Amino acid sequence: MRGMGNMQGMMKQMQKMQKEMAKAQADLEVQEFTGTAGGGMVTVKATGKRVITDVVINEEVVDPEDIEMLQDLVLAATNDVLKQIEDTTSQTMGKFTQGLNLPGM
């Protein structure tokens, strides 16, 4: 019967961890991230749900003769913000799986 008490304790611990993970995920989804390129000439903001909420382009980089550079800056700023979201998500959610030795995690 001692094994049953241990199993119940483990189940409670898992349920608690699931709740904490859900809260962490919800917090990440509403967090705002900012990516930049060109020394801040282009800024892209997004939520943790990877929804772009704002794009700001400094007028100094708008050159009708060099649209390609502007496109590259927007792309770089977008990739920067997405990487920040990915890194923060991995770091935050990794705290829950650390030390569990789960296959594939």
Curated annotation (Swiss-Prot):
Disulfide bonds: none annotated. Its main location: cytoplasm. Signal peptide: none annotated. Transmembrane segments: none annotated. InterPro entries: YbaB-like_sf, YbaB/EbfC. It is found in: Cytoplasm, Nucleoid. The keyword Protease does not apply. GO terms for cellular component: bacterial nucleoid; cytosol. One of its GO terms (molecular function) is DNA binding. Keywords: Cytoplasm, DNA-binding. It holds the Pfam family YbaB_DNA_bd. Belongs to the YbaB/EbfC family. Homodimer. Binds to DNA and alters its conformation. May be involved in regulation of gene expression, nucleoid organization and DNA protection. This is Nucleoid-associated protein lwe2654. The lineage of its organism: Bacteria, Bacillati, Bacillota, Bacilli, Bacillales.
